[in-house]
Each structure stands twice: as structure tokens, then as C-alpha cells.
Amino acid sequence: MNDRQAALDQALKQIEKQFGKGSIMKLGEHSDQNISTISSGSLALDIALGVGGYPRGRIIEVYGPESSGKTTVALHAIAEVQAQGGTAAFIDAEHALDPAYAKNLGVNIDELLLSQPDTGEQALEIAEALVRSGAVDMLVIDSVAALVPRAEIEGEMGDAHVGLQARLMSQALRKLSGVINKSKTIAIFINQIREKVGVMFGNPEITPGGRALKFYSTVRLEVRRAEQLKQGTDVMGNKTKIKVVKNKVAPPFRIAEVDIMYGEGISREGELVDMAAEVDVINKSGSWYSYKEERIGQGRENAKQYLKEHTDIRDEISKRVREEYEIDGSNKEPLDEGEETLSLLDDE
């Protein structure tokens, strides 16, 4: 047994000498066993994710039909990163980002790094350069479907380019996954939905860009509109369901229901009323909502309005709900990792 241990120790020393300190270690000696996270900007989604937010150093895919709220979900995460003093980048391959809407969601557009690349290769090379800097906390690519290979852009209309985009994504993710993990960057890929022709049984819906993103993603979120939210005859927004269809860090298949209001994004008060009532932090009796035996509104909309006007009570309820769901922020790390991440520039 001693000979085996000595041989193992010798092998570990050789590996560390060749590849650097920390290239191999016992898991128990690793200082970062708990997964550090950054809030998604939505209480309901933080709870559905199971760890209180998006895991750092991982790839996230957000997909769904058109106008379902995918970009809104990503922009809320960017606002949360910036609020904690972090740096975020948005690669707008669709050339469709609305700065005014992003600002309404809390994004500091003056500090947001924005790129509107011409080709898929350019977009992914920019993404790699940003991640390798070690100074970007969140990177959003909107969207995978718009990452058009250079050969397709330079070719003629109607030319067949079979599998080009899938190969591009597969190669890019092989290069990106390791450095994303080292740099603790959260990479959010927004994706669209297509339908396979001739599918008789099962779900005909697929996401563009091949299968690589499905494999490399730690978390996959499906965003869908459930119903319209109306005030009289006017449509004010949508009730949206966000389903965690894949999760490597917590149990999957949880669903977060949020109100996405036009021009405002996710209603924090709406999800707070729902989640607080679920764990009896807020009591619901008939149509009345009450907190600490004080009525805060008749009907959900009035309770939402009360919390919007009384931010101190809203924050107090939010803190209690997070404690009930055991996502009180104990796994949050400072976003500024200091000099350590800069060594990524010298990798390879």
C-alpha cells in the first residue's frame, strides 16, 4: 500500500511540475467546493435553479419561442451583475438590443460592453477574448441562431451550407468551456426554436446550432408565455413560465412563474407575492393578502402595488422568503477576483 501511495505522490508531483500547481488535487483539498452563484435578478428563478442563481464559470442556455422573454431574462441577470460591481458584455448577433428597454430593467448601459459582430466566427472570437481576459463576470450571446458562419454570409442566396453552424458551435464550445470555468464567467447563450419537418410523434421542436450547446450547458432554461396580463382591455404584459429543463448543480424540472410587464421586465413584486404566500410569509385569506396581521391589499395586483410603494417591507419579505428557501446568499462570492484571473491571458 505504501508503494502505491508513493507512486501516486510521485505521479501527482510530476503532473503539477508539468502542468502547474492546482492542475490536479484531491477534491477535499479544493477550497471552492461550494458552487458560487450570481442571482438571476428574479427571486422565483433563483429558487427554481436550486442554488440561488446562475452558477459561476458555467454555460447557460436560455431558449424559447419568439417574444417569450428570453432577452429580458438575460438583461435582468446583467443588471444584477452590474449592481454587485461586476462587468458584463452583450454580444448582439441579432442587432436587436433596445438600450432604452435595457435601462428600464436596471442595466447600466454606459458600462455595458456591447458588440454587434458581422459573422458567427467574429462573435465567438470576441467572446473568447473577453472570457480569457478574466475580467468579465457575465457574457450574453443573443442569439445562437444569428451566429451565421462566414461562408454562408459570403456565399450566394440559396447555397446549401449543411452543418456549418453546428460545426462552428461545436468547435467554439470545445475552446470556451475550459476557460469559462477558470475565469468564473457566466456565459448565457440565448437560442431560438425551430420545428423538424415530418415528425409524427414526440416533440418536433429543436434548437439551432447542433447538439454541442445542450451537452456543454450546465443549466438550460425554457421560456414560454403562459397567458396575457390585462388591465381592462389593455394588455400590460405576460405571465411567463421558465422551466429548468437541465440542471447539473441541483434537481431539474422546476418551474418559475413570473410576470413580464411591457417596458418594465420581470415584476419583482408579483413573484414576491406568489413565493411569500407559498411559504406563509404572506397570509392569503380569500382575496386579501396580509403581512404580520396587517392587510397589504385586496387582490394580487393591489398587493403588488403596496410592495412597490413600501420598499422596506418588500425587502424584509424578500429576505424572509430567501431564508425559507435556504438561498440567503451564503454562496455568493465577491465578483472582483483580483490578480489571479489575469493569468488566463498567458494560458496556452
Curated annotation (Swiss-Prot):
**Where does it localize?**
Cytoplasm
Q: Which residues form the signal peptide?
A: none
Q: One Pfam match, by short name?
A: RecA
CDD domains tied to this protein: RecA
Asked if the keyword Cytoplasm belongs to this entry, the reply reads: yes
Q: Where is this region: Disordered?
A: 325-348
Please tell me where ATP binds in this chain: 64-71
The Gene Ontology biological process terms listed for this entry are: DNA recombination; DNA repair; SOS response
Does the record bear Nucleotide-binding in its keywords? yes
Q: Which GO terms describe its molecular function?
A: ATP binding; ATP hydrolysis activity; ATP-dependent DNA damage sensor activity; damaged DNA binding; single-stranded DNA binding
| One GO CC annotation | cytosol
State the InterPro entries in the record.
AAA+_ATPase, DNA_recomb/repair_RecA, DNA_recomb/repair_RecA_CS, P-loop_NTPase, RecA-like_C, RecA-like_N, RecA_ATP-bd, RecA_C_sf
Q: Where is the composition biased (Acidic residues)?
A: 336-348
Listed Basic and acidic residues bias regions: 325-335
Role this protein plays: Can catalyze the hydrolysis of ATP in the presence of single-stranded DNA, the ATP-dependent uptake of single-stranded DNA by duplex DNA, and the ATP-dependent hybridization of homologous single-stranded DNAs. It interacts with LexA causing its activation and leading to its autocatalytic cleavage.
Could you tell me what this protein is called?
Protein RecA
**Species of the source:** Listeria monocytogenes serotype 4a (strain HCC23)
Lineage at the top is:
Bacteria, Bacillati, Bacillota, Bacilli, Bacillales
